A protein has these predicted regions:
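Residue register of alpha-helical TPR repeats
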Residues: 97-99, 135, 139, 179, ...
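Short C-terminal boundary/hinge segments that cap the last helix of small helical domains
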Residues: 40-58
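Amphipathic alpha-helical segments of tetratricopeptide repeats
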Residues: 81-89, 122-129, 161-168, 201-212, ...
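Alpha-helical adaptor scaffolds
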Residues: 137-214
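Residue signature of alpha-solenoid helical repeat architecture, marking inter-repeat boundaries
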Residues: 55, 91-98, 132-136, 172-175, ...
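Structural register within alpha-helical repeat arrays
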Residues: 64, 104-107, 140-144, 184, ...
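Short alpha-helical DNA-recognition segment
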Residues: 1-18
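DNA major-groove recognition helix of helix-turn-helix/homeodomain DNA-binding modules
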Residues: 30-45, 270
Length: 270
């Protein structure tokens, strides 16, 4: 076997590695890959090791969470909470704590209760602390948008773009980040927080340039129309947003077209 000192030499300090092992520190992808190489473990082998915890995969959790939220299923949310609580006690993995925080805030929302800032702060502190954002951090941020204070959302959106740049060539990453930016724009417009939106539109357009993600391109255009409308360029903004709704009807998405129209109607002739 290899000691912690032998494994970490020249890559990270021994105290850092010990804290990482206990879940008290995050590590950059570059250093993590170097550690795997030092241990003669391929990334594929690492994935197989992770597969041992397939029953506890984040993907499975997110699918169940989505089902619960779409159906306003409080019973399922409570069951998910109990499951994640058991997993946190068993594995002491921070993701289970993050999941518990997210679930508890949605339970509060459905019960008409206030959010819990001290819990949400654990998620924002984690996001500020991580040096490189991967899929986990992007999804965590996206799933926490309803709870994070508005004044922190724009700052975290800049961090999300900058700290995930290493993955900018990945189509999956581009798709995930563009969806999250779209959700951020929606949240900021909904809360009438228009400062900095223009920069987010530029970032989204740059991300989506050259892609075939027409649905997301159309959504960004829709929000841009509302932004222009609210900023005083009424006719142009209204035309752009209505064109986006028309495209949805052409794409045979009348349900989404109605949802967009209802959102737009809130800003017409205010």
């Amino acid at each position: 076997g290899m000691t912690l000192e032998e494994a970490s030499k020249g890559i990270v300090s021994l105290p850092f590695l010990s804290k990482f092992e206990r879940g008290e520190h995050e590590i950059t992808s570059n250093k993590f890959i170097r550690l795997l190489s030092r241990l003669n473990i391929s990334y594929r082998e690492f994935e197989l090791i992770l597969g041992h915890l397939e029953g506890y995969s984040q993907t499975a959790f997110l699918q169940q969470l989505s089902t619960a939220l779409v159906n306003n299923d409080l019973a399922l949310l409570n069951q998910l909470y109990d499951d994640q609580k058991i997993l946190l006690k068993q594995y002491s993995d921070s993701r289970f704590e993050h999941n518990l925080i997210i679930i508890s805030q949605y339970i509060n929302l459905l019960n008409g209760l206030s959010f819990e800032p001290h819990k949400i702060k654990k998620i924002t502190d984690y996001l500020y602390r991580v040096e490189e954002w991967g899929e986990y951090e992007l999804v965590l941020f996206g799933n926490s948008l309803n709870f994070i204070p508005i004044e922190k959302i724009y700052n975290l959106s800049k961090i999300a773009i900058n700290r995930s740049a290493i993955f900018s060539k990945s189509p999956k990453h581009v798709n995930e980040l563009s969806i999250i930016i779209g959700n951020i724009i929606h949240t900021l417009i909904e809360n009438e927080h228009f400062d900095g939106l223009n920069n987010l539109f530029i970032q989204a357009e740059n991300l989506l340039s050259g892609t075939d993600n027409f649905a997301e391109i159309n959504r960004i255009n829709f929000y841009k129309g509302i932004y222009l409308l609210v900023q005083g360029n009424y006719d142009k903004g209204l035309s752009i947003s209505q064109q986006a709704i028309s495209i949805l009807n052409q794409m045979r998405r009348p349900d989404l077209a109605r949802e967009y129209k209802d959102f737009l109607d809130q800003y017409i002739e205010r």
